[in-house]
């Protein structure tokens, strides 16, 4: 079931964000200091608790929170599914729910994250000519629109 995220979900949300980012981005950014010293569950949970992000976040919860989508206006700001539950339709359910219930029209994807780009293309998004540097790195984000 897809529902609005609550404070009770914070630790699970942070856990998903930290571990999926480590698994997906470590080979792209090659920054172990960031991945294992800065990117930690407790600080991520605190950051989300101290902001209004939860007001814009949905989770996929079937008794276990397995994925999340963060929507800011027309943008899909984040979409992550726990590594243990990927390729089971959870990300697809989240993005299709967002497309149906929110005016989402664009997102940014890491240019070298070809798996996510293919996923978004399968859900009606296409690459544009717009790109920007990921802050503090030499890697680019590419804009995708639907």
Kindly label every feature range from the protein language model.
Residues 85, 89-97:
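Conserved acetyl-CoA pyrophosphate-binding loop and the N-cap/start of the following alpha-helix
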Residues 1-15:
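A short beta-loop-alpha structural element at the N-terminal edge
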Residues 54-67:
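Conserved beta-hairpin
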Residues 107-118, 133-138:
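Conserved beta-strand-loop-alpha-helix junction that forms the acyl-donor binding cleft
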Residues 120, 125:
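Conserved active-site tyrosine of GNAT-family acetyltransferases
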Residues 18-46:
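Conserved GNAT-fold acetyl-CoA-binding loop/helix
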Residues 95, 100-112:
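Conserved GNAT acetyl-CoA-binding A-motif
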Residues 75-86, 109-110:
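A short, internal acetyl-CoA/4′-phosphopantetheine-binding micro-motif in the GNAT/acyltransferase core
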